[in-house]
């Protein structure tokens, strides 16, 4: 669906915008090395600061004690042809920010964000010393929506995706399989989904409070 070379004991906000400037993502690393991200659309908050990271087995923590090694910005604008679909040619135009982090145990984590004119995505790329796999116990990635609205989703289920879609206020969704599509009260349509799962568990959305998942 993700150069600053000096870390200090203070918050470190880093920003990335869509090519047309309408969507802005802000990444922040606080004094404890904890990561959050936030998103605004058209200058208005869309996702308020939300947690990132994972907790693994045997004390592995991919959510705190990190320092920024460097941050790299790139832009890509290309057109590719899909074999079938509504449109034959697809424009792939985005700005990318790769935030490279390291903790005291020399665990390295790259957060790769891509912001398009019509959405954004991010992914985790991690390298843990002396292990060939990571047993994930908890995913801390959250989506703290700034506004309520109308949503369309199916209930979270580990057995099937063949369930009836329900229409509910975002704040009334207790859990959901992705994609969860919604329209905020100020008219922004969006959908939360995942992609490129390689040897990794699928995600479900769990309501915590308000419009937070």
Question: Where do the PLM segments sit?
Answer:
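Sec-dependent N-terminal signal peptides
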Residues: 1-7
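N-terminal accessory beta-strand-rich subdomains and adjacent acidic, glycine-rich linkers
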Residues: 13-213
